[in-house]
């Protein structure tokens, strides 16, 4: 259990949040949400002591253990994978090492024997005899194969390290578990495993995530950081979102009515204040006006970008035909014998256990890379807009955002360019920001503005939700659902896939699976599960 009392975090004159009084109890999972910069990660850091609060206290239950998902991927490079996980339970790791050091002494004394006996008792109480098998089970569940367990962390890829550090945080079933963006760099199957694990977790969990399906699957409560305060609501993210939108609409209507009433009273006073016959009535209305309290909606930290894709022309009957496409990169066969036709109104999500396969496929379809075998043909009516996974090469120049966007636009007038940048939340002087200093999320929003200007009827999106906050993801999602054209995309966002796509193509070294069905049905179908295994054998 974690108790927060009168917590305030302030940097200079800027107050992130204040007067926070919350209690996080066992058996519940709390999803922490808020706009970028609202203080989600900072709040987690105050809970585990990563930073000091300006004032207030954080209290952990007596004799309880708190575990945090580590963000430094190089901290354990000189440790084996299995030992890195075991270190997640610091007291158990200490006892293990102290016990082993005693037994290794050449002059093992009677006193050492007594000490060793005490350590053995502690070791057993902490279920130490099952520690290595429990750690191995976690690693396997997260997709780290057994032949990697004794390797050093420095030998692993970045994505494999993320999984090991997640296993470290989960190890030993801590009383309090704090996870900051745990699904980053995880494939969809691993995210599903983590959802099931946390759904059955009996202790206290606090999680920051931009994955709506993940939050909906595991959270019993939503903790919203906004208006410089932190509020807790029962229910998952979707329940909070729909409730908050309804409350905002109701408050706006109430404010509008109050404003209309105020104007009516002011007009009455102005017209009749000099009229003696009505002076009593005027005085009465003056008192009403003084009592009328119009509660303005406080300016939220949340901003929803205006993402709108408007095709300049409708797609014809021929969209895209792919025949016998294959590609091997660095000796790894990514896909082979791809054959499919894209039909009108298809919104296709491409899946693969090797995420590089989708990126290479999209690069081929954009004529950036040649396939090893096969061909592809786009229809004559097709115009394409592409959101690549790696956008770094687009932002190397020391130019303003206005000049950056002008490179991709026939209309280079200030008004036109400001309009598109404004839709992507760059307003006022922000349009003069330099392109080479943008954050990951800002870059993606610029790339979306570039796409919107093209007025394309086919959108190619490689992991489009990367670096975006929940508000941008929601806006992007809603737009793609309504888009009157074709979508070819990859994604690790379950909700994005489920709500946007109407067709699934999974590609692998042994061919492909092509199904007209929803994603939830696809991943729960036993027959398809067998086909998916054969795809990678």
What are these regions (language model features)?
Residues 113-116, 186, 283-294:
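Extended non-transmembrane interhelical loops and adjacent amphipathic helices
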Residues 297-321:
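Amphipathic heptad-repeat alpha-helical coiled-coil/stalk segments that mediate oligomerization
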Residues 1-255, 312-537:
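ABC ATP-binding cassette signature C-motif
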Residues 103, 241, 270-273, 277, ...:
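A structural signal for long alpha-helical coiled-coils and helix-turn connectors
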Residues 136-142, 267-271, 287-292:
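Short amphipathic coiled-coil heptad-repeat segments
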Residues 251-271, 278-287, 303, 526-537:
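ABC ATPase nucleotide-binding domains
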Residues 277-281, 291-301, 377:
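Proline-centered turn/helix-capping motifs that create local helix->coil transitions or kinks
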């Amino acid at each position: 259990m974690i108790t927060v009392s009168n917590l305030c975090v302030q940097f200079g004159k800027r107050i992130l949040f204040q007067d926070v009084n919350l209690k996080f109890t066992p058996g519940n999972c709390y999803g922490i949400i808020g706009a970028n910069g609202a203080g989600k990660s900072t709040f987690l850091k105050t809970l585990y002591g990563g930073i000091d609060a300006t004032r207030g206290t954080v209290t952990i239950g007596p004799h309880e253990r708190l575990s945090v998902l580590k963000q430094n991927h190089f901290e354990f490079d000189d440790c084996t994978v299995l030992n890195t996980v075991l270190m997640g339970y610091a007291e158990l790791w200490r006892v293990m090492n102290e016990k082993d050091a005693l037994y290794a002494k050449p002059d093992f004394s009677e006193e050492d024997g007594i000490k060793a006996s005490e350590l053995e008792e502690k070791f057993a109480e902490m279920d130490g005899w099952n520690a290595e098998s429990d750690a191995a089970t976690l690693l396997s569940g997260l997709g780290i194969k057994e032949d990697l367990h004794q390797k050093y962390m420095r030998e692993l890829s970045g994505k494999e390290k993320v999984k090991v550090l997640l296993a470290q945080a989960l190890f030993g079933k801590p009383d309090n578990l704090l996870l900051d963006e745990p699904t980053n760099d995880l494939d969809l199957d691993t995210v599903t495993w983590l959802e099931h694990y946390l759904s059955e977790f009996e202790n206290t969990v606090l999680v920051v995530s931009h994955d709506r399906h993940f939050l909906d699957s595991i959270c019993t409560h939503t903790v919203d950081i906004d208006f410089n305060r932190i509020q807790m609501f029962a229910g998952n993210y979707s329940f909070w979102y729909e409730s908050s939108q309804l409350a905002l609409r109701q408050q706006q209507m109430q404010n509008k009515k109050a404003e209309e009433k105020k104007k009516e009273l002011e007009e009455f006073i102005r017209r009749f204040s000099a009229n003696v016959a009505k002076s009593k009535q005027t005085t009465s209305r003056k008192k009403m006006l003084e009592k009328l309290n119009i509660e303005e909606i406080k300016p939220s930290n949340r901003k929803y970008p205006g993402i709108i894709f408007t095709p300049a022309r409708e797609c014809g009957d021929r969209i895209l035909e792919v025949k016998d496409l294959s590609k091997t990169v660095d000796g790894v066969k990514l896909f082979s014998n791809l054959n499919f036709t894209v039909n009108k109104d298809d919104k296709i999500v491409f899946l693969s256990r090797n995420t590089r396969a989708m990126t290479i496929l999209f690069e081929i379809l954009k004529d950036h890379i040649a396939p090893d075998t096969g061909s592809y043909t786009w229809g004559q009516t097709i115009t394409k807009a592409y959101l690549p996974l790696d956008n770094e090469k687009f932002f190397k120049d020391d130019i303003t955002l206005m000049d950056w966007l002008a490179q991709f636009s026939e209309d280079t007038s200030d008004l036109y360019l400001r309009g598109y940048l404004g839709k992507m939340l760059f307003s006022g002087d922000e349009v003069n920001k330099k392109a080479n200093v943008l954050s990951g999320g800002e870059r993606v929003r610029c790339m979306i503005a570039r796409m919107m200007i093209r007025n394309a009827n086919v959108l190619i999106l490689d992991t489009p939700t990367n670096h975006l906050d929940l508000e941008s993801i929601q806006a992007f999602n809603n737009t793609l659902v309504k888009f009157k054209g074709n979508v070819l995309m990859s994604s690790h966002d379950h909700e994005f896939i489920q709500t946007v796509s109407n067709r699934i193509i999974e590609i692998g070294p042994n061919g492909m699976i092509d199904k007209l069905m929803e994603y939830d049905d696809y991943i729960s179908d036993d027959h398809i599960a067998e086909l998916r295994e054969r795809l990678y054998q």
